[in-house]
């Protein structure tokens, strides 16, 4: 079990590194990686023009559990929304436009595939 957790952690970290490089190549400016606060963690916070972008990175080595981007369900969206509001307020960036993107990274033996889903979801309210 420890090996599996280590493998998952490695997959996640590699996916985040690849996503950050991909976003920079696409013109995003990375502001934070693995930002943590009392509400949780967000993988990447970046700037795309005048927009602050909160990016969730999902990485998979196989399709056994479905497409990576499908792992960002309502609970995860709620958590990311809370973190984003906290970040914008504490950094005094709440006058900026914000957006939620997902980067899906598929790491397979035949090669890597990175997909950027802009505006993947809206700000989630509730609970």
Curated annotation (Swiss-Prot):
Xref: Pfam families: UPF0102
Chain ranges passing through the membrane: none
InterPro entries: Restrct_endonuc-II-like (IPR011335), tRNA_endonuc-like_dom_sf (IPR011856), UPF0102_YraN-like (IPR003509)
GO MF terms held by the record: nucleic acid binding
Domain of life: Bacteria
Disulfide bonds listed in the record: none
HAMAP family: UPF0102
Family of the protein in this entry: Belongs to the UPF0102 family.
Protein name, entry field: UPF0102 protein SYNAS_23220
């Amino acid at each position: 079990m420890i090996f599996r957790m280590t493998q998952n952690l490695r997959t996640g970290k590699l996916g985040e590194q690849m996503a950050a490089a991909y976003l920079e190549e696409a013109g995003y400016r990375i502001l934070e990686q693995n930002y943590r606060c009392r509400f949780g963690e967000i993988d990447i916070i970046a700037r795309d023009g005048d927009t602050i972008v909160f990016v969730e990175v999902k990485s998979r080595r196989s399709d056994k559990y479905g497409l990576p981007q499908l792992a960002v369900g309502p609970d995860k969206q709620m958590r990311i929304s809370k973190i984003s509001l906290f970040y914008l307020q504490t950094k005094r960036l709440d006058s900026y436009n914000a957006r939620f993107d997902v980067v899906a990274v598929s790491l397979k033996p035949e090669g890597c595939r990175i997909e950027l889903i802009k505006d993947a979801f809206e700000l989630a309210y509730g609970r």
